[in-house]
């Protein structure tokens, strides 16, 4: 029997008076990779922020590893092994690549460390070549690699990637997808948001589509490939 790492039920989340999430149920099992899809403004990032405690839901419940974390601060969610790579990246530009990674390791969960400093550098050879570069000296793609590398240094059980390849050149985007495959093979659960549904569904086990803050589809990648009308209807592709 699989272990449910995230179990969110009946989420209603608002920005001021704007009702964004409308009764969303969302779950993540151990070792599962999930694609979260939807057009712009449909609630994807809001759902991720609700899971992380950044934008607490007004109604509903978020359970992490069986513990009720609804409305708890993000650092408490992170301590339970959930790492969040937000859209727009989040590195310390005045610190070197090495310092960024070392700092993340100190903030990570205790116990066995599957993702060591050496393993991260092996996975991200570009970062290994730029250890003494400041974060602000890196390209957009390298900054994204550093952000993901920092998250892995915390040794998470769940990795959340919001707009994983947004604004990246095709060659760099392919490298990010390669890294996503490595992460999946390592056994980490992942939630991936990205506009490139073809790449997403090559990696994911299950996919969720949001429309106006409601779940309108949940199913396997194979189902989406077999029935393209679902993507056409809800994503316009």
Please annotate each region the language model reported.
Residues 56, 68-88, 113, 117, ...:
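ABC ATPase NBD coupling module
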Residues 37-39:
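The feature captures the beta-strand-to-loop junction immediately N-terminal to the Walker
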Residues 159-163:
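Catalytic Walker B motif of ABC-type/P-loop ATPase nucleotide-binding domains
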Residues 151-152:
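ABC ATPase C-loop
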Residues 134-138, 142:
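Conserved ABC ATPase signature
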Residues 52:
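Helix-to-loop junction immediately C-terminal to a conserved catalytic motif
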């Amino acid at each position: 029997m699989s272990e449910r790492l995230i179990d969110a039920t009946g989420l209603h989340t608002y920005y001021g008076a704007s009702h964004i999430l409308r009764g969303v149920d969302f779950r993540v099992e151990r070792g599962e990779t999930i694609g979260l899809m939807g057009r712009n403004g449909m609630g994807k990032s809001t759902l991720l922020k609700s899971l992380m405690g950044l934008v607490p839901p007004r109604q509903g419940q978020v359970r992490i590893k069986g513990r009720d974390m609804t409305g708890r601060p993000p650092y408490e969610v992170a301590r339970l092994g959930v790492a969040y790579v937000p859209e727009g990246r989040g590195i310390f530009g005045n610190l070197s690549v090495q310092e960024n990674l070392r700092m993340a390791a100190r903030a990570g969960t205790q116990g066995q460390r599957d993702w060591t400093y050496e393993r991260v550098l092996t996975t991200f050879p570009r970062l290994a070549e730029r250890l003494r570069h400041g974060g602000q000296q890196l390209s957009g793609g390298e900054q994204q690699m550093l952000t993901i590398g920092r998250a892995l240094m915390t040794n998470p059980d769940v990795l959340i990637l919001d707009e994983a390849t947004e604004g990246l050149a095709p060659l760099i985007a392919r490298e990010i997808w390669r890294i996503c495959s490595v992460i999946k093979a390592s056994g980490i659960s992942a939630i991936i948001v990205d506009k490139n549904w073809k790449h997403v569904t090559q990696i994911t086990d299950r996919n969720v589509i949001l429309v106006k803050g409601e779940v309108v589809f949940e199913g396997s990648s194979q189902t989406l490939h077999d029935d393209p009308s679902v993507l056409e209807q809800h994503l316009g592709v």
